[in-house]
């Protein structure tokens, strides 16, 4: 059972990204009057981007910024007109105002467009002007820092806003491809970013936050950036100071985010150089956990209640003149309701980031059951082939009966691990539980615009909040799964009494979360499936800690079998379902449930084998479940002729094992374990045959 690692390539590159699933498609899109208005508005905007008048070019860039924010339909229309190429040209405009607005528009495109549009920007040469901006911004920033009175406040504000836009674009590009990352590495961006963090007291939090986010992303598995940070003691001291700073009453969501990002960067560059004073600090226990744990107490239910209240009773909306007659747009003109919604979303994103870092901490905890077996060579395989006849006749003495049936003892856990488990499980479960806004309706086309929804009986929807909530649920479940996996336990033998009660108590809430996810009908099925997989991982971890004690219900078994047998289901999902079932089957008071699960696990190898990894797990669990022939439910294995089925499956199992591609990622480890399972099956069959029961 593998832990969920933090995978940069798979992580959504931008926390502001809202899924496109709520956009009308096909005939619905064509029939939408608002869609027709957008088409009419796009053409004059594109024309004015190339106007000879500075005011018109500025207006057009600002209009793009406003139109595309959380509005994928308009963004796609503009993309079709090559808005990316037109805006990149405007970065070289003779007017600084046009350049600033163009950078803001490109920044918003990065945020809302995702990987594809970032790749388009990179391919169309956006790095060339961005590289030229870095020294210019550095020079102006230094001038303002040295002499704050050297420039009016409005000019300073424009410098900070422009810097934030450029940094955000670079951050998004860095996660687009290795090619883009290498291009960013070549411009030595780390000193530029660290300057904002070092001078954070004198600068707006928004630009410091952008610099911290970019630094965090660049330091993920990126040796050039890591080395650049580790080489300067001032940088490390700055990151430690930010991470350990005490929260003040005036801190907002960005202040929290900056601390969490600095902590994440410290983890990315660890271990710290031995020559530095900070090298002796245990970053996880001394910095990360004290910083992150209090953040997990944030109530999603309260946040959703505030969002719904804001959506239901918003202030009087601002006038919305036709775009064709509008004056210069101002993206900062936000209503109080919009500011509330953005504040809550930022808080959710900080929470998601904290969970991401905590997941990494749990992923790096030592595995309780390391694999130490060596690969079986060809000579051993030939010996196994010669064992088939002996196994069928039950005359093999290769495995002693006591060895075959000896259960593992309960692994020990230190008191700090137990305390951490007891503290985090309730917090993570609360963050894993779906809210009324976690999954939007398939017919919901609401965007971030505030509208009076009091006339309808349906709950108000807000896609940005929904997107953030789903991300929090996934991160919390993955973190919970890693936490449970890091706790020493085994698939057989006695369970650890120190955490048994908390695991048993957590099981109903975790199962309820999965059931809520499965019965929901969101517009974004991929995201729901992602949450479901994460929930199964957490349930597996809980089931292992409470193995044989959790009382299984028929609903549990039926649901897990249904998920595992779904058409096109991923092997990893099957593995999780099989793992949960294997733990549920070991409750000695539920003999009928055990019978149903045993028959299902045997179906993975007989009459025809299923996918390799789930089959290996099913066989391994069958051995664990029926290792003690004196158990109350052993009659189920005997009545199902389990020994004969396993004996007859040895040739099939051998083919599965040999079919594992060791060249693929994880192939070597899977082959080692598969060889172990095959050997265990052979020994188990021999042992059961000798019992003559």
Language-model segments: which ranges?
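Fungal eukaryote-biased detector of long internal structured cores
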Residues: 114-116, 122-353, 357-373, 441
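Extended, charge-rich low-complexity regions and/or helical-solenoid scaffolds
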Residues: 2-5, 481, 485, 489-665, ...
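Buried hydrophobic core positions in alpha-solenoid tandem helical repeats
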Residues: 44-46, 83-89, 121, 126-137, ...
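Elongated alpha-helical scaffolds that mediate protein-protein interactions in large eukaryotic proteins
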Residues: 30-41, 48-59, 63, 67-85, ...
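Short inter-helical turns and helix N-cap capping residues of alpha-solenoid HEAT/ARM repeat scaffolds
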Residues: 52-53, 94-95, 138, 159, ...
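Eukaryotic acidic, Ser/Thr-rich intrinsically disordered low-complexity regions
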Residues: 300-304, 308-309, 336-341, 362-363, ...
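Acidic, serine/threonine- and proline-enriched intrinsically disordered linkers and terminal tails
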Residues: 2-35, 139-159, 287-471
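Alpha-helical solenoid repeat architecture
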Residues: 58-72, 86, 100-115, 158-179, ...
């Amino acid at each position: 059972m593998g832990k969920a690692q933090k995978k940069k390539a798979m992580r959504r590159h931008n926390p502001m990204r809202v899924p496109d699933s709520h956009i009308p498609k096909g005939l619905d899109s064509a029939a939408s009057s608002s869609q027709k208005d957008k088409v009419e508005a796009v053409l004059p905007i594109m024309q004015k981007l190339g106007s000879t008048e500075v005011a018109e070019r500025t207006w057009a860039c600002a209009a793009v910024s406003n139109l595309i924010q959380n509005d994928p339909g308009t963004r796609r229309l503009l993309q079709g007109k090559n808005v990316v190429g037109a805006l990149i040209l405007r970065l070289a405009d003779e007017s600084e105002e046009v350049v600033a607005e163009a950078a803001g528009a490109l920044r918003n495109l990065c945020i809302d467009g995702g990987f594809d549009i970032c790749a388009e920007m990179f391919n169309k040469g956006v790095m060339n002007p961005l590289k030229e901006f870095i020294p210019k911004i550095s020079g102006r920033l230094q001038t303002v820092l040295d002499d704050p009175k050297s420039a009016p406040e409005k000019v300073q504000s424009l410098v900070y806003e422009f810097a934030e836009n450029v940094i955000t674009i670079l951050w998004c590009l860095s996660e687009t491809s290795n090619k883009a990352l290498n291009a960013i590495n070549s411009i030595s961006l780390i000193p530029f970013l660290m300057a904002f963090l070092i001078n954070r007291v004198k600068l707006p939090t928004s630009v410091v936050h952008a610099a911290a986010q970019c630094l965090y992303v660049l330091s993920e598995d990126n040796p050039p950036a890591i080395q650049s940070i580790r080489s300067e003691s001032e940088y490390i001291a700055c990151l430690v100071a930010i991470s350990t700073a005490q929260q003040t009453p005036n801190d907002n969501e960005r202040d929290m985010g900056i601390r969490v990002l600095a902590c994440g960067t410290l983890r990315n560059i660890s271990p710290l150089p031995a020559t530095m004073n900070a090298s002796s600090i245990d970053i996880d226990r001394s910095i990360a956990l004290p910083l992150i744990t209090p953040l997990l107490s944030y109530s999603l239910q309260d946040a959703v209640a505030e969002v719904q209240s804001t959506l239901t009773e918003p202030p009087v909306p601002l006038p919305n003149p036709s775009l064709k007659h509008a004056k210069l747009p101002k993206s900062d003109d936000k209503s109080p309701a919009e500011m509330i919604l953005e504040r809550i979303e930022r808080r959710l994103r900080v929470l998601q980031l904290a969970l991401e870092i905590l997941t990494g901490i749990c992923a790096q905890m030592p595995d309780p059951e390391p694999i130490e077996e060596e690969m079986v060579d060809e000579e051993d395989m030939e010996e196994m082939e010669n064992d088939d006849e002996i196994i069928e006749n039950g005359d093999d003495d290769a495995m002693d009966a006591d060895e075959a049936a000896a259960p593992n003892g309960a692994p020990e856990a230190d008191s700090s691990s137990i305390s951490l488990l007891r503290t985090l499980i309730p917090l993570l479960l609360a963050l894993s539980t779906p809210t009324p806004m976690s999954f939007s309706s398939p017919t919901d086309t609401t965007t971030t615009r505030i509208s009076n929804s009091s006339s309808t009986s349906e709950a108000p929807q807000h896609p940005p909040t929904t997107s953030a909530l789903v991300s929090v649920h996934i991160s919390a479940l993955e973190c919970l799964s890693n936490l449970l996996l890091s706790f020493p336990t085994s698939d057989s033998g006695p369970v650890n009494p120190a955490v048994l009660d908390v695991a048993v108590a957590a099981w109903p809430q975790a199962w309820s979360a999965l059931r809520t996810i499965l019965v929901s009908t969101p517009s974004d099925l991929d995201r729901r499936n992602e949450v479901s997989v994460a929930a199964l991982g957490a349930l597996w971890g809980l089931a292992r800690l409470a193995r044989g004690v959790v009382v299984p219900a028929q609903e549990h078994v039926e649901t897990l079998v249904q998920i595992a047998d779904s058409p096109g289901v991923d092997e990893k999902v099957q593995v999780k379902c099989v793992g949960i079932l294997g733990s549920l089957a070991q409750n000695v008071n539920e003999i009928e449930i055990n019978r149903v699960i045993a028959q299902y696990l045997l179906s993975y190898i007989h009459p025809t084998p299923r996918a390799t990894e789930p089959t290996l797990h099913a066989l391994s669990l069958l051995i664990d479940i029926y290792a003690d022939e004196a158990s109350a439910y052993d009659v189920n294995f005997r009545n199902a002729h389990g020994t004969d089925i396993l004996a007859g499956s040895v040739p099939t199992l051998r083919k599965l094992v040999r079919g594992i591609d060791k060249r693929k990622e994880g192939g070597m480890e899977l082959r080692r374990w598969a060889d172990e399972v095959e050997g265990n099956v052979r020994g188990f069959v021999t042992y059961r045959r000798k019992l003559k029961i």
